[in-house]
Design a protein with these regions (language model features):
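Extended, hydrophobic alpha-helical segments in both membrane/secreted and soluble proteins
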Residues: 66-72, 76, 91, 110-114, ...
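Inter-helical turn/loop segments and adjacent helix faces that build the functional surface
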Residues: 38-43, 77-81, 135, 159-164
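Anaerobic metallocofactor- and corrinoid-dependent redox/one-carbon enzyme cores
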Residues: 1, 9, 90-99, 107-110, ...
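Catalytic alpha/beta active-site cores
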Residues: 1-58, 80-90, 118, 124-128
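Short glycine/threonine-rich loop-to-helix capping motif typified by GTGT followed
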Residues: 15-21, 56-68, 94-108, 135-145, ...
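Active-site or pore-adjacent capping/gating segments
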Residues: 112, 123-178
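Glycine-rich and small/hydrophobic secondary-structure elements
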Residues: 28-33, 103-122, 144-153
Length: 178
């Protein structure tokens, strides 16, 4: 069973990266407390949780946000007296960054979000259809979304490096600040 801890609503409502991270951790802690109150053993929660964050086109900041999420989760587990478990993290390209006036530019925005998700360490990267802002995505939009991830992985080798942003001054500093 997978339990989703999702902070995309904070992002899509205009929240900052710090607010999105705060919402994510608050959602996780609230879910754990509710499960505990209902009699469940919360020690199993970390390995059953799927954390979901939105990623926008500002890839430097988005990479740092994803890295900060992992650090924050480790601190939450420590504060609750639980063993540190790897965080299953999903990155979903932002709906608020998509425009209906020029949907073709959304391909570039989605590519930046896909890059941020991959380099930021997301286990699952989901790219929205570039024409989603116009209504129900058409076949071309869905196919492009799927292929964006494949091209990023195969052509640029994003999946071949364990931690491409590790040690980068900007990413480490911003992740710490967040």
């Amino acid at each position: 069973t997978t339990l989703r801890v999702d902070a995309r609503a904070v992002h899509e409502a205009g929240g900052s990266e710090a607010q999105e991270l705060g919402g994510l951790m608050a959602h996780a802690v609230d879910t754990m407390r509710r499960l505990e109150a209902a009699g469940y053993d919360i020690k199993a929660f970390p390995e059953q949780a799927l954390f979901t964050l939105a990623t926008g086109a500002n890839y430097g900041l988005e990479i740092a946000k994803l890295r900060a999420a992992r650090r924050l989760w480790a601190r939450v587990l420590e504060a609750m007296g639980l063993d540190s478990e790897p965080m299953l993290l999903q990155s979903v390209s932002s709906a608020r960054m998509l425009t209906r006036y020029d949907p073709w530019v959304n391909m570039l925005r989605n590519t930046a979000a896909c890059f941020a998700g991959s380099v930021g360490g997301a286990d699952i990267v989901t790219v929205r259809a570039f024409n989603e802002a116009l209504g129900v995505p058409e076949e071309l939009g869905r196919r492009t979304a799927r292929n964006t991830q494949i091209i990023a992985m195969e052509e640029s080798g994003l999946g071949r490096v364990a931690d491409p942003a590790g040690g980068a001054w900007f990413e480490e500093t911003v992740a710490t600040d967040l």
